[in-house]
Amino acid sequence: MKTTHTSLPFAGHTLHFVEFDPANFCEQDLLWLPHYAQLQHAGRKRKTEHLAGRIAAVYALREYGYKCVPAIGELRQPVWPAEVYGSISHCGATALAVVSRQPIGVDIEEIFSAQTATELTDNIITPAEHERLADCGLAFSLALTLAFSAKESAFKASEIQTDAGFLDYQIISWNKQQVIIHRENEMFAVHWQIKEKIVITLCQHD
C-alpha cells in the first residue's frame, strides 16, 4: 500500500501523519505487522486503516528509540512499550499517531456537515454545553466537531478507562487554543487546531 509520512509539531509533541491509498492495498501488505493473523477476518477498510495507523505509530515510537509495532490489546487498543503512552486516530485516507511519556490522546475528524451536526448534537453535548458552543464564535458544525474530537482525545488520555459516554465529559471552558473538559474528579486540557477541513485535538493528561 502506498503511503506518505509527514510530521507536525503541536502542543509540545510531534504528530506523525501517514496518508495512504486504499486502492492499491493488497493482503500481503499486512505481513509487515507481527499480528497480521488477528486481522484476517477484518474488512478491507479496517485493514487499510489499521496498517496506516501502525505505520504512523512506528514513526512516532522512533522518536523515543523504539523499533516495534504496537500489538492489539484485549479491548482492540494499541499496546505500547511499558515506558511510554501513545494514541492513534484515522480520518478518511489519513492516519495519525503520537507518543509521549505521559498519558495522551489524539483525534482527527473531518468537519461535520450541517445535517450531521444536527443529527448528532444530543449524543455529544448537553444543553449547557450547547450554550457554551453557541458563544465560542465558530460555526456550529465546526464547534460540534471540535467538541466531539476533544472528548475523544480526553477519553483516550484518561488512565481510568470506563464506560463513560460523551455526555459524561463536560466542556467547561473554551479558547482559541484549548478546550477544558471535566469528568468526575478529572480535568483535561485539550489542544486543538483546524487544518483545512480537518479538526485535530490532543490531550496530555498529567
Curated annotation (Swiss-Prot):
Per its record, the protein catalyses: apo-[aryl-carrier protein] + CoA = holo-[aryl-carrier protein] + adenosine 3',5'-bisphosphate + H(+); apo-[peptidyl-carrier protein] + CoA = holo-[peptidyl-carrier protein] + adenosine 3',5'-bisphosphate + H(+)
Keywords, A to Z? Answer: Enterobactin biosynthesis, Magnesium, Membrane, Metal-binding, Transferase
**Cofactor(s) the protein requires to work:** Mg(2+)
Q: Where in the cell is it found?
A: Membrane
The entry marks the following residues as binding Mg(2+), namely 107, 109, 152
**InterPro entries to which the protein is assigned, alphabetical:** 4-PPantetheinyl_Trfase_dom, 4-PPantetheinyl_Trfase_dom_sf, 4PPT_N, Enbac_synth_compD-like
Q: Per the UniProt record, which EC number(s) apply here?
A: 2.7.8.-
Reading the lineage from the top rank, the first entry is Bacteria
The task this protein performs is described as: Involved in the biosynthesis of the siderophore enterobactin (enterochelin), which is a macrocyclic trimeric lactone of N-(2,3-dihydroxybenzoyl)-serine. The serine trilactone serves as a scaffolding for the three catechol functionalities that provide hexadentate coordination for the tightly ligated iron(2+) atoms.
Q: What is this protein called?
A: Enterobactin synthase component D
Source organism of this protein record: Escherichia coli O157:H7
